[in-house]
């Protein structure tokens, strides 16, 4: 495990190499402890893990203790419950309750209930119930039920039940068991099991409805 100074230098070199934004780089530059470094990482979670891919779950495990990661709300393995703010990556499973906010990446799994908010990237898996809100990108998979709201981007896959609401963008794929899916953008596909229809949109203007 690197010393704090070695770790700080390594992270700054990686951030500079990947053209980090000024604010994010400054947070790392001004860091006085490993806790500060983790704050810089969580404040720029999407960029660090998905855009730049400058580190991964293994890097976190190799350079921070499980206690240090947990104090920052970061989970890379095992099962955890959160009702505040959490960041999941690696093989972690997080159950989010109340008004919790979880950002998930990699192969992480999130189970969201109540008014929890989840942002899922990579190949993360999310099960959303109640009035949970999910934003899914990359190859994320979401199973939504209750009054959950999902926005699916890239190649995300969504299965919707109950009164769930889904907005499908890019090349996302939605299996709709509710009949409530009303937005398809770019190249999204919605398979409506409730009304026995398939909706396909390619580009900005062409919409095809198949009975």
What are these regions (language model features)?
Residues 1-105, 109-113, 119-121, 127-129, ...:
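Short, glycine-biased loop/turn motifs at secondary-structure junctions and
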């Amino acid at each position: 495990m690197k010393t704090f100074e070695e770790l700080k230098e390594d992270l700054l070199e990686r951030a500079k190499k990947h053209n980090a934004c000024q604010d994010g780089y400054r947070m790392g530059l001004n860091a006085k402890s490993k806790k500060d470094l983790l704050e810089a990482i969580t404040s720029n979670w999407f960029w660090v893990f998905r855009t730049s891919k400058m580190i991964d779950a293994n890097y976190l495990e190799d350079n921070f203790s499980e206690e240090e990661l947990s104090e920052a709300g970061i989970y890379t393995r095992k099962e955890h419950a959160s009702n505040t703010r959490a960041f999941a990556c690696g093989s972690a499973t997080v159950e989010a309750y109340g008004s919790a906010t979880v950002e998930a990446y990699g192969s992480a799994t999130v189970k969201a209930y109540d008014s929890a908010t989840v942002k899922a990237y990579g190949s993360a898996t999310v099960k959303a119930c109640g009035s949970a809100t999910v934003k899914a990108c990359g190859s994320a998979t979401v199973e939504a039920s209750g009054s959950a709201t999902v926005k699916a981007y890239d190649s995300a896959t969504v299965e919707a039940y109950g009164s769930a609401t889904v907005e499908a963008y890019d090349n996302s794929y939605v299996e709709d068991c509710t009949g409530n899916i009303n937005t398809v953008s770019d190249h999204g596909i919605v398979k409506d099991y409730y009304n026995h229809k398939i909706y396909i949109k390619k580009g900005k203007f062409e919409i095809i409805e198949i009975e």
